[in-house]
Each structure stands twice: as structure tokens, then as C-alpha cells.
Swiss-Prot record:
Keywords: Capsid protein, Disulfide bond, Host nucleus, Host-virus interaction, Late protein, T=7 icosahedral capsid protein, Viral attachment to host cell, Viral penetration into host cytoplasm, Virion, Virus endocytosis by host, Virus entry into host cell. The keyword Nucleus does not apply. GO terms for molecular function: structural molecule activity. Belongs to the papillomaviridae L1 protein family. One of its GO terms (cellular component) is T=7 icosahedral viral capsid. HAMAP family: PPV_L1 (MF_04002). Residues 476-499 are annotated as: Disordered. The lineage of its organism: Viruses, Monodnaviria, Shotokuvirae, Cossaviricota, Papovaviricetes. It comes from Human papillomavirus 33. Transmembrane segments: none annotated. Gene3D superfamilies: Major capsid L1 (late) superfamily, Papillomavirus. This is Major capsid protein L1.
Amino acid sequence: MSVWRPSEATVYLPPVPVSKVVSTDEYVSRTSIYYYAGSSRLLAVGHPYFSIKNPTNAKKLLVPKVSGLQYRVFRVRLPDPNKFGFPDTSFYNPDTQRLVWACVGLEIGRGQPLGVGISGHPLLNKFDDTETGNKYPGQPGADNRECLSMDYKQTQLCLLGCKPPTGEHWGKGVACTNAAPANDCPPLELINTIIEDGDMVDTGFGCMDFKTLQANKSDVPIDICGSTCKYPDYLKMTSEPYGDSLFFFLRREQMFVRHFFNRAGTLGEAVPDDLYIKGSGTTASIQSSAFFPTPSGSMVTSESQLFNKPYWLQRAQGHNNGICWGNQVFVTVVDTTRSTNMTLCTQVTSDSTYKNENFKEYIRHVEEYDLQFVFQLCKVTLTAEVMTYIHAMNPDILEDWQFGLTPPPSASLQDTYRFVTSQAITCQKTVPPKEKEDPLGKYTFWEVDLKEKFSADLDQFPLGRKFLLQAGLKAKPKLKRAAPTSTRTSSAKRKKVKK
């Protein structure tokens, strides 16, 4: 007798179909019109370790913090191509098309000489040298902090996108209700935030919130002990559906360890007894196992520079192939190979004998940038399918193009007063419409306005000439050549001689 039994195998149902994300090349048409745009010389001067605040007003800064270990996030503003004055507008239909910019060329210029900047802490929690110790040290005292300086990890970085970059760092997480006491090791949480101009990079001590996770303010140098060091979240930006945050990136990092030390203080988690055999005498009590190194970025050389050279964007890593939505582009730069800290000295009192108290010492760091771009003019045909896709991607784009829902005309009776300035009636003053808020207004960026710095004469600029050369294009002649004049030499007629 045969008996039917249901299958015990797992049945997998197909996923619900969703709309696919397509490349911008499928709905953005490129033209043969190119423009050059470049910034002026961008300079920054400040203190490399901390900002100097006004003694009477803590909210006002006298000297900002400018370090070679900071991110420089440039928010480059572009003109609206739909309001651009073109000599010939026959290449597009403003009723059915909209214009956008595509970034096809970029060069980040860096001034100032190569140099290695150092940092440190006048009271660093460094107990003993664990690299070449010739005898077992004794127990630490009440305060064993020392003045120590070091150089940092070497980093060169360039990120390009039409949205600000995303960074990651480790911060203090939320503990459960039945967790350990508050003075124990806090839980860690990976936090994603937008990288802003002035944020500190990873210096070799990890990307973490040092202000929250290090209560002694002495485990790292003074320029990061009260800050958060961020690292670009490449995994998240490369997996972004629309690819707006990261068109492409250039990265070069190197580091080695110079010295090895350990920390003083009570270990919150002691070394288990089964991992060592107890000693006697000076080794009866083991030393701190909280080891840490001092990083170093090693030699800097002009042969390994990422800057002062052009880069051409043929194909982006994501679905956005260089289209600058919102008429803006974000350029994120890190360059620790030019992190020299200059020492300034002023004389307080003049004396024939040198005395330290007769002089004041100051430290400053300077940075110099120059941004150059080549943009290609593109057009988007506004079909119903394309507009639906763009609205799902970013509805602000259609709003900037002045597309929106028009309310139907009202059929209800409206009230109109005769004496609009009379105090006997309610105020008839119309409330002005609120200006559109900048969604990125709460973040800090280095604003670069290129709205009036576009030029179609690419051959008049260094990056434009490089682009014309590699693209095989020729610049339009500026001077008309003089037409060659033809001179005829008429042969003299022979006189007839009568014989």
C-alpha cells in the first residue's frame, strides 16, 4: 500500500521583484560641450594641535585648529546649467529636457614643501620601554606620565562624489540593564557619520572616539585626545545603490612601528594565572600588559605623490558615472606628507644674555590647495519613466528643476477685505514663503564657489590643455590667418620691329 508523504525539503520562494538601479548612462545623454573650472589659491593657517579660544568668549575662536592630519572636505558649488547662457541653445529642448554637469577631469594641486609633522603629549601615559629592557622594572608610582613626541601614519587620500563621504569610528555603545558596573570597560559600537572638514584622520592609534573612551586624556597625543578619528567607510560607500558618495577614490597608506611601550594604571582585565608561572623578587608582581606602539609614517618622497597630476573619469565605480546632482561635487583630501609644523618666536624683553623667559614660542601649520575640473554638459530627457526613477532616487532634483504637483484650482469662496490696513480686522500681511533649507547645512565643509568661474576656452588653462591632448580634441583657433596674397609678374611685351 503506497502512502503519500509531504516533502521534507525546504522550499525557497523567489524574492519579490523590485525596481533595479540603473546606470546614469542609460538616461543621461552626453554632449560634445566641455567647460573648465578652477578655484583660486586656497589657504589655511592655524595651530596644529588645538584651537585657541577667546578668554572672554569661549564660543569665539582666535586661532582655528589646522593640522596636516585633518580631512579637507571641499563642497564645490557649480552653476545651474539650465540657467546658463549658451551661445547656441539648439542642442537641447528646454521643454522636454534638463541639463546637468558630469565631472570628467580633476586635478588637486598641493603647494608647500614635503615635510613630516610630529605630535605628542607633555603628559603621555607611557610607563616603560618594553622593546629593549635590560632589567625588570618596578611597580609604577602614582604618576609616571612623560613628555613624548612621535610622527604619525602616512596617508594620502582623494575621494570624489556628489554627496559628502561617510566615515566610520568606534564609539561608546549602550550596555544592557544587567551589565557590569559603570567603571568597567564600556561596550563598543561601530558608528557611521559624515566626514566633515576638520575631522581627524586615523593616525595609527585606531579610528575611535578618544574623548569618550579614554578618560585619562593621556593615552594618545594632545591633537587627538579630545577628538574623534574617522576612517572612510569604503565598504558602505562602494555598496551604495546609486553611487553618489563615491565616484572614485585614490588612497595610499603606510606605517611602521618605531617604539614599544606599556601603560601605567590598574588593569581592568588581569592576565590569567594559567598563562604564566609566578616569579619571585622583582618578578613577583607582573608588569602592565597594556602594550602600545608609537607609529611612524617613514620617509616622504615626491615619487609617491597622488597630487599635482590629472585624473580622468571614464567609468565610475558605482551607478553614478560622474553626474553632479544638485550642481555640487564633494572633494575629500588627506595629505600628511606636507604636515610640517612651523615654529615662530617673538622677543618679550631684550637682554644681552640668552634667557628662556625672554622669548615666546608659537606653532603654526599652513596648507595650500588648488582645485581644477573639466565638466561635460549632459542632458536628461524627461520621460515619465525617467522622472519616476529620479523622484524615487532623490525628489529634490525634480524640485530644483521646478517640477512639482500643481494644486487644483479651489472652488470654494474666498474672503477679501476692503480695508486691509484696518486694526478692526485680522492681520492681512502675507507670510513670505520659507527658503528651502540646506539638508547639509548643519555640517562643516570648505565652501568653494565656482558659479562664475566656468570657461569654454579649455586651451587657456593647464588642465584644459591636458584634457584636449588626451581626448584628441583641437582648440578653436583664436586668430584668423591672413589670406595669402598672390603677386603676378606680367611679362613685358616685345615691340614689333618693322623690317
